[in-house]
Amino acid sequence: MRDIHHFIGGASFTGASERFSDVFNPNTGEVQARVQLATTGEVDRAVQAAQAAFEGWSSTNPQRRARVMFEFKRLVEANMNELAELLSSEHGKVIADSKG
């Protein structure tokens, strides 16, 4: 069974907690993965990373932000099937729902 760990500040890592929550397949009800639960320190780390990212992003001029967002949109569209598979796996959604 696959374990899903954390992604904070641009890096994935295995957290310190030994606690996990099951992710269920919505079609069968079976457990398809486990997501690691964060410690208080890891939540604080995620909040700090988000605050640091916001500082840089909020000071970026609107034209640059628009270019970044359009490139993000292009990448999402180009990788829609793979992203839908990942989202379905991580959240227990059916593929059609993951695609929106």
Listing of model-derived features with the role each one plays in the protein:
Residues 1-34, 67, 71:
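Terminal low-complexity tails and localization/encapsulation signals of metabolic enzymes
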Residues 32-100:
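Glycine-rich loop-to-alpha-helix module at the N-terminal edge of alpha/beta enzyme cores
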